[in-house]
């Protein structure tokens, strides 16, 4: 009897459907609490979705940087259409075997390259200081590529120095 409570998970469901349609990907299941109750308990409005992406052996990417001297690129867009185009470029490069590692950006590029660098203690030097390195970028991907490409934004390069360098600032990853 509370439309606002029903509206929250329903809006989340519509948002999830929109994301699936935009990315041409499907969720395989989920759970909702549309009614806000379970037996005699009050339950907050909730929507949980899960999905899998079946891959062939060799198609799986990890997040840790792999080698010194590789370019690191940003795949992102400001509009849904640009985001979809960036995802398609990234996917084509991954299927061609050119993506060595990748990270789904959450809390900014600085966090992404710091976490990617920690796995194999490979450093990173930023080459693009125009970007806001600390701004959230939902839907963006940072990728280490084995070859140079012209259809993505190059943000830096992997280095032998065990540090993340953003302009004059540097942070050790040791």
Per-region residue spans from a language model:
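Conserved strand-to-helix beginnings and helix N-cap segments that scaffold or border functional pockets
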Residues: 3-6, 84
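Acidic/histidine-enriched ion/cofactor-binding microenvironments in catalytic or ligand-binding pockets
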Residues: 41-46, 56-74
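A general structural motif
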Residues: 50-57, 76-87, 106, 127-128
């Amino acid at each position: 009897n509370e439309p606002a409570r029903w509206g929250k998970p329903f809006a989340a469901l519509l948002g999830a459907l929109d994301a699936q349609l935009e990315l041409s990907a499907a969720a395989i299941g989920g759970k909702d609490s549309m009614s806000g109750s379970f037996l005699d308990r009050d339950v907050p409005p909730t929507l949980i979705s899960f999905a899998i992406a079946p891959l062939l052996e060799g198609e799986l990417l990890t997040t840790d940087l792999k080698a010194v001297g590789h370019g690191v690129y940003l795949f992102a867009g400001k509009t849904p259409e640009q985001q979809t185009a960036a995802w398609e470029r990234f996917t084509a490069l991954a299927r061609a075997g050119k993506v060595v590692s990748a990270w789904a950006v959450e809390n900014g590029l600085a966090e992404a390259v710091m976490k990617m660098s920690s796995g194999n203690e490979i450093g990173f030097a930023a080459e693009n200081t125009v970007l806001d390195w600390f701004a959230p970028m939902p839907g963006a991907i940072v990728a280490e590529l084995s070859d140079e490409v012209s259809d993505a934004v190059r943000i830096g390069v992997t280095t032998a120095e065990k540090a993340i360098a953003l302009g004059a600032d540097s942070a050790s990853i040791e």
